[in-house]
């Protein structure tokens, strides 16, 4: 598939315009423009062809793993021959592709919910934009009445979702397409007086299911996973084959030197990667104590327990960092290079 991009690396491009990606009724493919990241992504649902999977495993065994190694380096081959496209509701996983052609396989999370549909998808909810132009038009367009008033009595049994680069996508059952959690808005957020009431503990538990914790928790691969991914890199596979060939020709000194250098490089890369991930986790994970209005009572909670709709005391002396994106309901604050906000 070719991408027609006006400017290299620019998500404002007119590319990604061919159907069925822009078809709002398609349940196997979907294109979404992420305004916060200025990125276009394409989502496709897949499930396994059992007969093709059996043949693929047999080919891996008879080729001594060469077929499996090639499918690791060229994942599109495996997608084409082992899996088939499926509706999102019936898919085993999704593949996300950005405008630069990078693909990522993301697993589904299915969570028992048994709540009204409008608790996750409020009446103002709608499909995310497919292009930059559509995103700009949605900023000024009102939500259509058929979207605003539809599906009030419907309930969700299981909530189907996945995460891509720490953005959560939820499957909207009536349309069979994904919507981003960041576009969620409480229907009661119509005035500051209603927003000052905060939320209850029951509502916090309900929202925790699809929002998760208020913390950026960067996933950390195990040392074994990092080691395997490093060893299976094409460069090191070439080195391993070279060592075997030199050993067969009795060039043991050459083989030993190359093996020593390769092992040292792999171990060094492993430690450096682990160190970098640990540093990123430490920089991004922030938790502090916050004074929160919960069940009409003020109490101290961890900032990781904050949910959309919570009201917290920003004037608390111990609070030196704002723990979440928020709206100032009363008072004044100095932020962003001493710019006053009221």
Task: Please place each PLM-identified region on the residue numbering.
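Non-lumenal N-terminal regulatory segments of integral membrane proteins
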Residues: 2, 6-298, 307, 312, ...
